[in-house]
C-alpha cells in the first residue's frame, strides 16, 4: 500500500541494473557522474530501482538504504569481491558443476553488514529484484 503514490505520477523514473559483477560495478562510474552533473543523489533522482543478480545488490542498496554511490563502491571493494566469490578447491577443479558456483558464506556475511536484517518491504523506495542460484 505504501507504494501506491508511485502510480499517481504521470512519469516514473526507473533505474535498472544488469546482472554480472563487472556490469554492476561499471554502472557506478556513470551514476557518480550523473550525481555530479545533476547535483542530486541517485536515490532522489529515481522513483523505482530494479536489478538482476549482482545488479540487484545495487538496486537494494539504493532503494532500501537510500545509499550514496560511495556506499555502493564500498560494497564492491576487491576484498568483498574475494569473499563473495570464494570457491573451494573441489569447486575450482571439478569438471562438473553440481553446486552453486560460489559459496554463500562470505556473501551472507557481507550482505548482513550492509543490510542488517532488513526485509525488502522495509525499503525506502520501491525495489524489484530478480536472481537465481
Language-model features, listed with the residues they occupy:
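Patatin-like phospholipase
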Residues: 3, 7-16, 21-112
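Solvent-exposed alpha-helices and their adjacent loops that cap or buttress functional pockets
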Residues: 7, 120-122
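Conserved N-terminal structural segment that caps and organizes enzyme catalytic cores in eukaryotes
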Residues: 115-117
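Active-site gating loop/helix substructures
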Residues: 122-133
Amino acid at each position: 500500500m505504501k507504494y501506491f503514490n508511485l502510480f499517481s505520477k504521470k512519469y516514473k523514473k526507473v533505474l535498472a541494473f544488469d546482472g554480472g559483477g563487472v556490469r554492476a560495478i561499471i554502472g557506478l562510474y556513470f551514476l557518480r557522474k550523473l550525481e555530479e552533473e545533476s547535483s542530486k543523489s541517485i536515490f532522489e533522482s529515481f522513483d523505482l530501482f530494479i536489478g538482476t543478480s549482482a545488479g540487484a545488490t545495487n538496486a537494494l542498496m539504493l532503494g532500501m538504504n537510500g545509499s550514496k554511490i560511495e556506499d555502493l563502491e564500498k560494497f564492491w571493494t576487491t576484498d568483498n569481491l574475494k569473499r563473495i566469490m570464494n570457491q573451494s578447491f573441489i569447486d575450482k577443479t571439478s569438471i562438473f558443476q553440481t553446486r552453486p558456483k560460489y559459496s554463500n558464506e562470505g556473501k551472507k556475511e557481507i550482505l548482513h553488514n550492509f543490510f542488517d536484517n532488513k526485509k525488502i518491504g522495509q525499503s525506502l523506495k520501491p525495489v524489484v529484484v530478480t536472481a537465481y542460484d
